[in-house]
Amino acid sequence: MEASISFLGSTKPNISLFNPSSNVLPRRDFPLPALKLKKVSVLPRILHQKRLIRAQCSDGFKPEEDDGFVLEDVPHLTKFLPDLPSYPNPLKESQAYAIVKRTFVSSEDVVAQNIVVQKGSKRGVHFRRAGPRERVYFRSDEVKACIVTCGGLCPGINTVIREIVCGLNNMYGVNNILGIQGGYRGFYSKNTMNLTPKVVNDIHKRGGTFLQTSRGGHDTAKIVDNIQDRGINQVYIIGGGGTQKGAEKIYEEVERRGLQVAVSGIPKTIDNDIAVIDKSFGFDTAVEEAQRAINAAHVEVESVENGVGIVKLMGRYSGFIAMIATLANRDVDCCLIPESPFFLEGKGGLFEFIEERLKENRHMVIVIAEGAGQDYVAQSMRASETKDASGNRLLLDVGLWLTQQIKDHFTNVRKMMINMKYIDPTYMIRAIPSNASDNVYCTLLAQSAVHGAMAGYSGFTVGPVNSRHAYIPISQVTEVTNTVKLTDRMWARLLASTNQPSFLTGEGALQNVIDMETQEKIDNMKISSI
């Protein structure tokens, strides 16, 4: 038996008894005493959520003895189709799984979000473990699946496509699989192709996406109309935060219409800015490819007098690629990311640090994420904010701007001869095939998505949480952007490696500290804080 505690915009929750085997909504409600919520005025997007928190417990549930176990569960088709029949999983007859000690994942298997705990800590948030279930809710010969890719390119997309097709076919005997071409627009423009293991056999060796992609174009009603008209009952959506929000809307419309359609998201972002999961696919490949650009910049600046090389890497709001590429390379003197505001002039500023390094080494390399310093650039260029078709802010070229600022300062103010080298490998990094590590990772993501859809789960995304693959509600990965936390040890390791200034003593430092404190409050907001 489970008890579900519901916080629906009120400080006085209700508790309901819930039978996990029935997959239906709670039926008996009785009020709990009013609880005092920890007030955090900076969290409007969290406090407005109408989240259902399920605390697993014994039959004799006592709220005061709650150990803080929270299951962030994913929807199941039986939630709105209670009479949906189930069938034995075809993997029972699979030779591949014949010698596996434990073929099927138990409904009680969960993955903990936080594995570093102290004595007396609450058990915290958990997610359902990914993997095959003993019962499935689709007959193999009745499955009509489709796959769509949306948003920007990323190494590994083709591997995910290939492994979804091969997973459905080889593990579950599914033969009817469609590829939706050109992103979400492909649903209602009817651009499709049939996918078989033979068709996708070697696409993992190519960069880009075999199905083509686009930004924007999401029209929920048109998309679900097309899904319904075609008789599609499994939808696999590969894309970033905006794409996953679209996937959630598709699931909600499918549920509203009462359709037996499983909607599965596979998170994709080269920036590694997806929340909850350990990392996004393609990230390792991007970091590895970035080394070539950094090495080239280092060779260039070593070969001239007072050489300063700038390498601009991807990272709209999150500086993970720049940070990890810098740590991996060891030839970088300074790393600038969106999360850490910097300033140019004055004591402790970037210009002062550059001059010190040039006097010491006669050259230096700067790695900057594309989203860093955007306020400075916009102010300098007097540019207004514009957005792309996905609603993302169009970034100004901070690399070119910084190159010119450094050149002007040292030429006109310091009267120093300086040789600037600027490298922008953005499209080179994201357009390549995935490396061996990402290929394996993409395979696990694809197979986890297939197992989840066949088991009747819907409105979920997949990914590793503390190295264990889990099913995660889509809302969990779209509510917050994963960013580099300046209070974590990883950023401290980078500062120790480059010996660069922290930029906490100059203009914008106060706001930077406030932002860090706000992030800590978000991280610390657990079930134990209410």
UniProtKB/Swiss-Prot annotation:
Tissues in which the protein is found: Expressed in leaves, stems and flowers.
Essential cofactor(s): Mg(2+)
Pathway annotation: Carbohydrate degradation; glycolysis; D-glyceraldehyde 3-phosphate and glycerone phosphate from D-glucose: step 3/4
Site (Important for substrate specificity): 242
Positions bound to ATP: 152, 215-216, 240-243
In-chain residues carrying the UniProt-annotated modification Phosphoserine: 121
Catalytic activity: beta-D-fructose 6-phosphate + ATP = beta-D-fructose 1,6-bisphosphate + ADP + H(+)
Enzyme class: transferase
Record note on quaternary structure: Homotetramer.
Family: Belongs to the phosphofructokinase type A (PFKA) family. PPi-dependent PFK group II subfamily. Atypical ATP-dependent clade 'X' sub-subfamily.
Stated role: Catalyzes the phosphorylation of D-fructose 6-phosphate to fructose 1,6-bisphosphate by ATP, the first committing step of glycolysis.
Name of this protein: ATP-dependent 6-phosphofructokinase 4, chloroplastic
Organism: Arabidopsis thaliana
Name of the encoding gene: PFK4
